[in-house]
Curated annotation (Swiss-Prot):
Coiled-coil segments: none
GO molecular function ontology, one term from the record: metal ion binding
Active-site residues, record numbering mapped to chain: 73, 75
SUPFAM superfamilies: HAD-like
Family designation: Belongs to the 5'(3')-deoxyribonucleotidase family.
Pfam families on file: 5_nucleotid (PF05761)
Listed PANTHER family: 5'-NUCLEOTIDASE DOMAIN-CONTAINING (PTHR12103), 5'-NUCLEOTIDASE DOMAIN-CONTAINING PROTEIN 2 (PTHR12103:SF14)
Name of protein: 5'-nucleotidase domain-containing protein 2
A Gene Ontology biological process term: negative regulation of peptidyl-serine phosphorylation
Highest classification ranks of the organism: Eukaryota, Metazoa, Chordata, Craniata, Vertebrata
This protein's encoding gene: NT5DC2
GO cellular component: cytoplasm; mitochondrion
Function in brief: Promotes dephosphorylation of tyrosine 3-monooxygenase TH which decreases TH catalytic activity and leads to reduced synthesis of catecholamines including dopamine, noradrenaline and adrenaline. The exact mechanism of activity is unknown but may act as a phosphatase or promote the activity of phosphatases or may inhibit phosphorylation by acting as a barrier to interfere with protein kinase access.
């Protein structure tokens, strides 16, 4: 007997499938398994495998067999830094604000909170709002903060003219800097976001009037002073064991590539003396012999676009030489320059070059979009996020979330009072589950890769500007030098033969035309 869409019988089947799912998830949560079935029984088999935090993930197909030349950034690529660096940057910039910019002494009470912000957030300068935006320019509600306090969803929507959407002209441009909104993309921006939020919190808490643009610029300048004055370099040089991580793995990666006949180069914005000390610590005194070209103080990203800056050679003491550069020699150190001269002198072009960096805009965007290099993004946060994804709590929460989504979609067919009541309860529970899942990653902002269901703006850039991404350079040690990376085919919404949430609920109907007759 055929069941008509919207009938009481079909609704009964739907509610029965929910009851079964509730029993399974409750039993799993309580540590028991009805009929010897576990939480993972709710998931398709291919979803149950745990992810490897040391894996390399592909956005685009790439064979290392075709790569002849490997390039690297230095900070957070060759050299991974400990989180202990962030409190130093925060407290020093805070003190600079007080002592040099004459900010209130009361700001000194704030200490760095490593759990507050995540990378990839946007800051609306005129509204003093720190927020997470998805790939479609929508603010994720519940992730907007002014100072250290959350801003109600209603206020966020009102601030943007009755919508969560941020218009394109206001959004960050190609390098993450728009007219009024900036995106914080590098790892060094974590203490900057924390300090900015603390200063705004102090001014608001003490009812002090301030110009949002001036405050933003002062905080940014104070953070910049920490770098420009070389303070951060001094801290690292004084205690490399404390601040530099995985140095032996960096040496292993470089040595392995050279042993297989690959050519290597380094392009970094850091000064030579700092890079030299760090590389000696990680690799040894002969580190320069591993690289065919070394370029320091490159001034990325303008290095990739400005043709006017010539290369300058440094002598063994780090002093500038005056001779014209007609070739780039192995073992020598060069300063500034530009990519166009680099390409002309090396003839390293196109897909046979693979460059690694941590900053999607400054390191990778131009190389991929304008020059056709292959690119690899170093995302240290990936390791922690994958470990969270592998937890039973995450899988339980996400599975039940997806199940509710499928049930909500089907339950819309029924318009009686009882159905509407069930629908409202499910919507409330789904929202609660989304908040729980978000808090597993970060209580304020969630995952750097996802909003509730969409990719973040950060993820959109990651996919656009990188062929590969990984937690650290050492992940290369897990693969042969001729390995081919294949991205998994992710079905578009209209391509999926079965809806994942239907697989989870046991409602195996597919969205074929006959089953969606109520849609006109």
């Amino acid at each position: 007997m055929r069941v008509e869409s919207g009938s009481a019988q079909e609704r009964g089947i739907l509610l029965e499938s929910l009851s079964t799912l509730l029993e399974k998830t409750t039993a799993s949560h309580e540590g028991r398994a009805p009929g010897n079935r576990e939480l993972t029984d709710l998931l398709p088999p291919e979803v149950c495998s745990l992810l490897n935090p040391a894996a390399i993930y592909a956005n685009n197909e790439i064979s290392l067999r075709d790569v002849e030349v490997y390039g690297f950034d230095y900070d957070y690529t060759l050299a991974q830094y400990a989180d202990a660096l962030h409190p130093e940057i925060f407290s020093t910039a805070r003190d600079i604000l007080i002592e040099h910019y004459k900010y209130p002494e009361g700001i000194r009470k704030y200490d760095y909170n490593p759990s507050f912000a995540i990378r990839g957030l946007h800051y609306d300068i005129q509204k003093s709002l720190l927020m997470k935006i998805d790939a479609f320019h929508y603010v994720q509600l519940g992730t907007a903060y002014r100072g250290l306090q959350p801003v109600p969803d209603e206020e966020v929507i009102e601030l943007y003219g009755g919508t969560q959407h941020i218009p394109l002209y206001q959004m960050s441009g190609f390098y993450g800097k728009g007219p009024s909104i900036k995106q914080f993309m590098d790892i060094f921006s974590l203490p900057e976001m924390a300090l900015l939020s603390c200063v705004v919190d102090y001014f608001l808490g003490h009812s002090l009037e301030f110009d949002q643009a001036h405050l933003y610029k002062d905080v940014t300048d104070a953070i910049r002073d920490v770098h420009v004055k070389g303070l951060m370099y001094q801290w690292i040089e004084q205690d490399m064991e404390k601040y530099i991580l995985r140095g032996d793995e960096t040496f292993a990666v470089l040595s392995r590539l050279v042993a297989h006949g690959k050519q290597l180069f380094l392009i970094t914005n850091s000064p030579f003396s700092f890079v030299d000390k760090g590389m000696r610590h990680m690799v040894g005194p002969d580190w320069r012999q591993l690289f065919d070209v070394v370029i320091v103080q490159a001034d990325k990203p303008s290095f990739f676009t400005d043709r006017r800056k010539p290369f300058r050679k440094l002598d063994e003491k780090g002093s500038l030489q005056w001779d014209r550069i007609t070739r780039l020699e192995k073992g020598k150190i060069y300063r500034q320059g530009n990519l166009f001269d680099f390409l002309r002198l090396t003839e390293w072009r196109g897909p046979r070059v693979l460059y690694f960096g941590d900053h999607l805009y400054s390191d990778l965007a131009d190389l991929m979009l304008r020059h056709g290099w292959r690119t690899g993004a170093i995302i240290p946060e990936l390791e922690r996020e994958i470990r969270i994804i592998n937890t039973e709590q995450y899988m339980h929460s996400l599975t039940w979330q997806q199940a509710l989504t499928g049930l909500l979609e089907r339950m819309q067919t029924y318009q009686d009072a009882e159905s509407r009541q069930v629908l409202a309860a499910w919507m409330k529970e789904r929202q609660e589950l989304r908040c729980i899942t978000k808090a597993l990653f970060n209580a304020q902002f969630g995952s750097i890769f996802r909003t509730f269901h969409n990719p973040t703006y950060f993820s959109r850039r990651l996919v656009r500007f990188s062929d590969l991404y990984m937690a650290s350079l050492s992940c290369l040690l897990n693969y042969r030098v001729d390995f081919t990376f294949y991205p998994r085919r992710t079905p578009l919404q209209h391509e999926a033969p079965l809806w994942m949430d239907q697989l989870c609920t046991g409602c195996m109907k597919t969205p074929f035309l006959g089953d969606m007759a109520h849609i006109r």
